[in-house]
Amino acid sequence: MSYDASAIRVLKGLEGVRHRPAMYIGGTGVEGYHHLFKEILDNAVDEALAGYATEILVRLNEDGSLTVEDNGRGIPVDLMPEEGKPAVEVIYTTLHSGGKFEQGAYKVSGGLHGVGASVVNALSEWTVVEVFREGKHHRIAFSRGEVTEPLRVVGEAPRGKTGTRVTFKPDPEIFGNLRFDPSKIRARLREVAYLVAGLKLVFQDRQHGKEEVFLDKGGVASFAKALAEGEDLLYEKPFLIRGTHGEVEVEVGFLHTQGYNAEILTYANMIPTRDGGTHLTAFKSAYSRALNQYAKKAGLNKEKGPQPTGDDLLEGLYAVVSVKLPNPQFEGQTKGKLLNPEAGTAVGQVVYERLLEILEENPRIAKAVYEKALRAAQAREAARKARELVRRQNPLESDELPGKLADCQTENPEEAELFIVEGDSAGGSAKQGRDRRFQAILPLRGKILNVEKAGLSKALKNAEVRAMVSAIGVGIGGDGEAHFDLEGLRYHKIIIMTDADVDGSHIRTLLLTFFYRYMRPLIERGHVYIAQPPLYRLQVGKKVEYLYSDEELQARLKELEGKHYEVQRFKGLGEMNPEQLWETTMNPEKRVLKRVELQDALEASELFEKLMGQEVAPRREFIEEHARYAELDI
């Protein structure tokens, strides 16, 4: 094929967005789909941050479309002389356009690249924008980025009404049969309500006939307390740090618990920065410096014994760090990591100075926090030997792998799969049925320790936990911690394979709790999966098929009315012979795997605490609330 001018294609307008959507929204799966909603919501939130909007309505419509409406100023509708088009049309049809580029329009905004509105428009089957401004109701419509109805006045605006209403339906040509998930919408609205204290957000779910209002006046301090819900608190009232350095506004809410977990959520201009950035690094550093400085001055620092590290000082801390700044620089369009050095400088200075004041004003709390860090240092030292199990010269060649691990032959972690299997009998079938070239099997005996109730040192004394830590090879902890190293990951797919009954569900929950609390980066990077073993074996004549749910079975039996068939229900993995287990659950060509994803850290943390934590009352409430949805297998 010749490579000349004829081979070069220029993508015009928004065609490039439709051609390569992942460049703009990170992918065309569930996350990318909901990213469209977040982009339009961000625009409405920007109006609130600028002081012009006090209420945002989000409506999930019966046809699957979504409406976002604010009571701000309304997108400008006058002509742009250089474009010869109304401003609202330019914003929705041109990349890198919008008020965010004009210094006076928005002091702070989350819409960094000026592509949000136009990208949503390009990736939607249709979009309708209505503007209420200067007493008039304006409307313009689009389809897949092209204008289908030019801007026109469709009537008078209700008296005093201003703002923008955007309704859009993501394009099935891009996203297939995906739909909006109300829980994801709810989670983001709740997040925004905490981050913009006093902003009223209303969610109308027309598909399920529900309406919810999110409004919080406590801001990030309330957010931190919600994050720690269900934990035993070291003190009741969360602290709030607020300050400005240069053009950067800093807000931090924090609270200490008696538990072993730490949770720090970070935001820049209301955008969740899942991968942290300069503000997170500066917060951790300033927090540690202030605590150490106070401890030294107050004589709390004992020279004997292990000294607290940064991780020890953070143990039990629940914090929310929010910065607002002009011209934020993020890594990638999906805004996962903040890069601005001035954000780090501001957070470092504001947090260090104000935290020292808080510690000096609250000596009893300061002493309790530092003594907890000293205990964490002692526990870390006690766990050091256990951690040595997972330090390897070569992650794929080690004499310290657990004896019951049936390892695979490949030395390429990207090809390797680890099946964590419930019970020795199922483990035996899995070992015989697997493809030993790339599949490893680790059978677990009985139920593993509930790490939500146990500390790290106790967890590392548990044989099943130690076997998993040793086999997986990354250590324990989070990104950037000395004892956690993703480079050591021996298997890029870690597959939890348990029975489809109540006991299996419990073991699966215990394992997920372990991964969430002590190996969360594996979940965040998509390495943890749940196998879906079949519930039924259906034989019609000589033909055998496997069914994975009661609904699937009922639908199939309806088709077979009047015919002779045999149905076998699998109560556990051990009932399947090695060939059946391979064919139904392990064969990459035929199996069904569910990837474990972490969309909302606050919701996940609360759920694990409710299900697996010390407090009985929240667990009882959860069970009573969800009992009507349960399927009993008695």
From Swiss-Prot:
Top-level taxon: Bacteria
Main location: cytoplasm
Role according to the record: A type II topoisomerase that negatively supercoils closed circular double-stranded (ds) DNA in an ATP-dependent manner. It probably also catalyzes the interconversion of other topological isomers of double-stranded DNA rings, including catenanes. Relaxes negatively supercoiled DNA in an ATP-independent manner. At comparable concentrations T.thermophilus gyrase does not introduce as many negative supercoils into DNA as the E.coli enzyme. Negative supercoiling favors strand separation, and DNA replication, transcription, recombination and repair, all of which involve strand separation. Type II topoisomerases break and join 2 DNA strands simultaneously in an ATP-dependent manner.
Organism in which the protein naturally occurs: Thermus thermophilus (strain ATCC 27634 / DSM 579 / HB8)
Protein name: DNA gyrase subunit B
Segments forming domain Toprim: 416-534
GO CC, one annotated term: cytoplasm
Essential cofactor(s): Mg(2+); Mn(2+); Ca(2+)
Entry remark concerning the domains of this protein: Consists of 3 domains; the ATPase domain (residues 1-220), the transducer domain (221-390) and the toprim domain (391-634). Removal of the N-terminal ATPase domain (residues 2-392) increases ATP-independent DNA relaxation, showing it is not required for DNA binding or cleavage, this enzyme still has some supercoiling activity, but in this case it introduces positive supercoils.
Pfam short name (any one): Toprim
Molecular functions per Gene Ontology: ATP binding; DNA binding; DNA negative supercoiling activity; metal ion binding
Cofactor note as given: Binds two Mg(2+) per subunit. The magnesium ions form salt bridges with both the protein and the DNA. Can also accept other divalent metal cations, such as Mn(2+) or Ca(2+).
Quaternary data: Heterotetramer, composed of two GyrA and two GyrB chains. Non-hydrolyzable ATP analogs induce dimerization, novobiocin also induces a small amount of dimerization. The two subunits form an intertwined dimer where the GyrB ATPase transducer helix of 1 subunit connects to the Toprim domain of the other GyrB subunit through a 10 residue linker. In the heterotetramer, GyrA contains the active site tyrosine that forms a covalent intermediate with the DNA, while GyrB binds cofactors and catalyzes ATP hydrolysis.
Site label Interaction with DNA, positions: K447, N450
InterPro entries xref list: DNA_gyrase_B_C, GyrB, HATPase_C_sf, Ribosomal_Su5_D2-typ_SF, Ribsml_uS5_D2-typ_fold_subgr, Topo_IIA, Topo_IIA-like_dom_sf, Topo_IIA_B
Stretches for region Transducer domain: 221-390
